[in-house]
């Protein structure tokens, strides 16, 4: 389970060095929901790969439940295949991470020494998340070294979304409390939201409270005030990951632990000048072009959404899903379904733990430029195995709550670089699939 930027880095290395390697990316959105049935359904995708069949494995399981994660890790260890873990130090695996500790330390020292801050709060992401805990440790350790008392070095946890910033400010100001001199945030989403909420309460940033972020997203650079942040080139993580695997394949012994050093960017939100690196007219042009493209795609998606809602069978649902994928910048796709979905009887439920491989069939695909329905699965597997070097196939679960109903496969999904709404699209498909499935079960029960 790896992010778009990391997979982009992997593919870039493969192409730069002419490696005869392709990538199969098994992905889940387990962290998108707290519903245990949904999370279980998402995790089934990781039962699919036979890890021993691969030459190298890249691991990013930071958002998985501990028991589910350990099950996957145990299978990877048993495979004997070299594995590189991203942003989580796992015993027996190579490890690459962002050196967030150093960047947070620099923020704290800068706020203390250059801006005279003496009270601090860390608005953090999920408790237990490895990267977040590293940043919390850097925050607390540095303040301890500076002699800042514990009551002036507080921490709150949330997720990596904007609500965490909003809630942190509300938490600090409830019952007449005042904001500290500085709020150090786990990422830019949190930082921007913290600034907005502080300003609603009458605080000025940076005059009354200073704020820092992390990641250097566009919102950080374009926001007013410009957010002090740390730039992370996540493509470099994927690139370095591929380099480690290539060294292993060539009989070399790379270092077990590697770090990507983020670049600290001081901006207006901590009281420093605008760094002057943004061409605002260029950014505005990009936003205008993007909004026009988004409008076209939104119209197409709305039409497909209506078809999804009106679909009366799973095959109609598949066709509507194919209409959606046809609008996206990719080289092909396949929708694999358990045939029992459409032939449901009360005694014939879908699997909840892994896939019934003998029941999977290709309900629809476009892998060779032509849309087709109901083709043998072996052709899809051959397409993946015989794909040119540098090809990426993204695979994620088609599930109905906890039931393993099938698999989506996207070939070279370039649209992911510019669009981050794939989850919303898939969630729509899964919601309609759940409705169809409930109707079938009701019909089977009545019969």
Give residue spans per PLM region:
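Bacterial carbohydrate/catabolite-sensing allosteric modules
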Residues: 1-307, 311, 315, 323-326
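Short alpha-helical interdomain "coupling" segment at the junction between an upstream regulatory sensor module
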Residues: 252-256, 421, 437-447
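Helix-loop-beta substructure at the N-terminus of cytosolic sensory domains
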Residues: 307-353
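Short loop/turn segments at beta-alpha junctions that line or gate ligand-sensing/allosteric surfaces
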Residues: 340, 363-381, 387, 413
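A short, aliphatic-rich beta-strand micro-motif
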Residues: 382-386, 390-399
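Short hydrophobic/glycine-rich mini-motifs in sensory/regulatory modules
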Residues: 396-408, 423
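Short beta-strand-to-loop transition segments that serve as allosteric relay/switch motifs
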Residues: 407-417
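Allosteric cytosolic regulatory segments
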Residues: 423-435
């Amino acid at each position: 389970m790896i992010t778009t930027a990391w997979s982009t880095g992997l593919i870039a290395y493969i192409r730069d060095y002419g490696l005869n390697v392709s990538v199969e990316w098994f992905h889940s959105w387990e962290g998108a929901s707290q519903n245990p049935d949904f999370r279980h359904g998402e995790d089934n995708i990781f039962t699919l790969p036979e890890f021993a069949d691969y030459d190298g494995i890249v691991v990013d399981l930071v958002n998985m439940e501990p028991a589910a994660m350990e099950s996957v890790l145990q299978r990877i260890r048993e495979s004997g295949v070299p594995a590189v873990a991203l942003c989580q130090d796992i015993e027996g695996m190579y490890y690459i991470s962002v050196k967030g500790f150093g960047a947070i330390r620099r923020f704290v020292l800068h706020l203390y020494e250059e801006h005279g801050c003496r009270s601090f709060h860390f608005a953090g992401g999920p408790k237990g998340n490895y990267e977040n805990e590293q940043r919390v440790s850097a925050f607390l350790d540095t303040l301890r070294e500076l002699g800042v008392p514990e009551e002036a070095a507080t921490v709150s946890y949330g997720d990596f979304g904007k609500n965490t910033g909003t809630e942190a400010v509300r938490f600090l100001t409830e019952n007449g409390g005042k904001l500290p001199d500085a709020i150090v945030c786990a990422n830019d989403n949190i930082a921007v939201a913290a600034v907005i909420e502080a300003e609603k309460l009458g605080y000025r940033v940076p005059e009354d409270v200073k704020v820092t972020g992390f990641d250097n997203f566009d919102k950080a650079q374009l926001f007013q005030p410009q957010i002090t942040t740390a730039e992370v080139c996540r493509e470099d993580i994927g690139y370095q990951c591929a380099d480690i695997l290539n060294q292993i394949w060539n009989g070399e012994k790379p270092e077990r632990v590697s770090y990507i050093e983020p670049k600290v960017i001081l901006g207006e939100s901590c009281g420093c000048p605008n760094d002057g690196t943004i061409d605002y007219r260029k950014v505005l042009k990009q936003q205008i072009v993007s909004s026009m493209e988004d409008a076209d795609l939104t119209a197409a998606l709305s039409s497909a959404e209506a078809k999804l809602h009106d679909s009366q069978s799973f095959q109609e649902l598949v066709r509507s899903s194919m209409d959606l994928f046809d609008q996206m910048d990719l080289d092909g796709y396949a929708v694999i379904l358990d045939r029992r979905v459409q032939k449901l009887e009360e005694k014939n439920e879908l699997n909840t733990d892994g896939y019934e491989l003998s029941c999977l069939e290709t309900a629809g695909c476009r892998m060779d430029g032509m849309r087709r329905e109901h083709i043998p699965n072996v052709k899809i597997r051959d397409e993946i195995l015989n794909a040119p070097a540098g090809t990426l196939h993204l695979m994620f679960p088609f599930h109905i709550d906890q039931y393993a109903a099938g698999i989506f496969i996207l070939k070279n999904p370039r649209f992911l670089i510019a669009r981050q709404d794939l989850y919303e699209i898939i969630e729509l498909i899964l919601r309609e699939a759940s409705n169809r499935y409930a109707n079938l079960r009701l019909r089977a029960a009545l019969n």
